């Protein structure tokens, strides 16, 4: 059964790393990142030693700008998703990260 989870973060000016982890092995099927303010940058997505943005950073313009990915990767407690975000502005920025995931059963 797929589960949708929304997490909200405040991103101060500069580059920040946020971590999404799950206690049980989980397959991420969809990842949507929405910025309340425009002009932010998704610098990288990393799971374990694997970088998920081989073409480099994604610049998101305009308020409400979003990044939608369907990466189909697994995460767990020892291999969380690290999301590197850059806020080039001078004030805090708000992001909402929505994931659709499915628990992996053995």
Identify the role of each PLM range.
Residues 1-106:
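Beta-strand-centric surfaces of beta-sandwich/beta-rich domains
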């Amino acid at each position: 059964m797929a589960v949708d989870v929304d997490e909200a973060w405040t991103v101060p000016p500069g580059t920040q790393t946020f971590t999404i982890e799950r206690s049980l092995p989980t397959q991420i099927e969809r990842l949507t990142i929405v910025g309340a303010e425009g002009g932010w940058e998704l610098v990288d997505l990393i799971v374990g030693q694997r970088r998920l943005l081989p073409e480099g950073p994604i610049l998101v313009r305009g308020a409400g700008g979003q990044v939608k990915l369907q990466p189909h990767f697994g995460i767990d407690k020892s291999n969380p998703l690290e999301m590197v975000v850059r806020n080039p502005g001078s004030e805090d920025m708000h992001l909402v990260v929505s994931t659709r995931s499915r628990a992996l059963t053995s």
